Amino acid sequence: MRGFGVHSEVGKLRTVMVCRPSLAHQRLTPANCHDLLFDDVLWVHEAQKDHFDFVLKMQERGVEVLELHDLLGQTLANQQARDFLLDRRITPNVLGSQIAEAMRPWLDEMPAAQLAAFMIGGIAISDLPEVKAKSLMLSALPETDFVIPPIPNTLFQRDPSCWIYGGVTCNPMFWPARRAETLIQRAIYKFHPIFLGGDFQIWWGDSDQPFANASMEGGDVMPIGNGTVLIGMGERTTYQAVGQVAQALFRSKAAKRVVGCLMPKSRAAMHLDTVFSFCDRDVVTLFAEVVDQVRCYSMYPKDDDGTFEIHPDNRPMLDVVAEALDLPQLRTVETGGNSYQAEREQWDDGNNVVALEPGVVVAYDRNTYTNTLLRKAGIEVITIRGSELGRGRGGGHCMTCPIWRDPAY
């Protein structure tokens, strides 16, 4: 029987969602990759092989792996789900009224799997021969222009939603280029047979309202256990969102403490999990240069309506986390090598590992210094190739959205 809920960062991982490299990555070019928030273009064939290996290694450890294209295709077989998604993606505000009117009937008749591929991989003018004839505007645009841009960052399933104890948030993303990812997750959680009627709540974010300055991405969110949630506040996650999530969790008595971790804002440390991740119940890997600068603010419930009080904490982040988990201290594995090598390995996601169970993690093979230190600390490190998958700046933690994970304490 499948369950729902993520109750730690290192308990037995039972169900996870991923997204394989596909059409969206085939459409990345040096000219458009930065607009689509990807640092580089991939050798897609090799990235697909490496991602398949990643999935296989999780499955060999008993993890159920759900794939986004498959889930979305199955979801869009439901007419209500199709309407939900297209009503929000194919609009005059997004496309212009003439293009929206020309495209909608074509998309309404499209097979579900093909529609899913286009919703993730984008729709170019060259994909629209039948529709193009009905729109003067489309006829005037270059064949390579996108009417619906690709969303290649779906490779990093950690961010658009995150499971926190017995529920999930649908995250309003910081950059407009990624916000369509959250809409896809909302459709899946609402309409896919796996989730329909499931025993979980959507804590926050399932709304069409503009979120203004409230943005959150799952790479910043860690339900570490013992009723505590860490939420990084750096480049992508804002205090406006953290406060609302804390209130929603406290209102439902789903958490007893939320720790906001104020981080320096930088591309290299865009999320908390790029500089800090759990490997075992008491072992973390971290990039000390950033983690040593983190300032913590603990939020505790005040009343049943979810209101809370905030307590600044002047202790190092590691002490705050250890105390929240009732541990005397955390054992740490810092990014390996000298200062140059450590900075390179952090950039290559050396600290962005995903735990399959206590003491077992998946990491990129290229981070040899950090992986060696993890093994010396007693961690089993399963490696996958990172030469292509890592070009978008994310490792095993970023590429996975745990849906069901056991407690660890």
From Swiss-Prot:
<keyword id="KW-0963">Cytoplasm</keyword>
<comment type="similarity">
    <text>Belongs to the arginine deiminase family.</text>
</comment>
<dbReference type="GO" id="GO:0016990">
    <property type="term" value="F:arginine deiminase activity"/>
</dbReference>
<dbReference type="GO" id="GO:0019546">
    <property type="term" value="P:arginine deiminase pathway"/>
</dbReference>
<keyword id="KW-0056">Arginine metabolism</keyword>
<keyword id="KW-0378">Hydrolase</keyword>
<comment type="pathway">
    <text>Amino-acid degradation; L-arginine degradation via ADI pathway; carbamoyl phosphate from L-arginine: step 1/2.</text>
</comment>
<dbReference type="Pfam" id="PF02274">
    <property type="entry name" value="ADI"/>
</dbReference>
<dbReference type="InterPro" id="IPR003876">
    <property type="entry name" value="Arg_deiminase"/>
</dbReference>
<protein>
    <recommendedName>
        <fullName>Arginine deiminase</fullName>
        <ecNumber>3.5.3.6</ecNumber>
    </recommendedName>
</protein>
<dbReference type="GO" id="GO:0005737">
    <property type="term" value="C:cytoplasm"/>
</dbReference>
<feature type="active site" description="Amidino-cysteine intermediate">
    <location>
        <position position="398"/>
    </location>
</feature>
<dbReference type="GO" id="GO:0019547">
    <property type="term" value="P:arginine catabolic process to ornithine"/>
</dbReference>
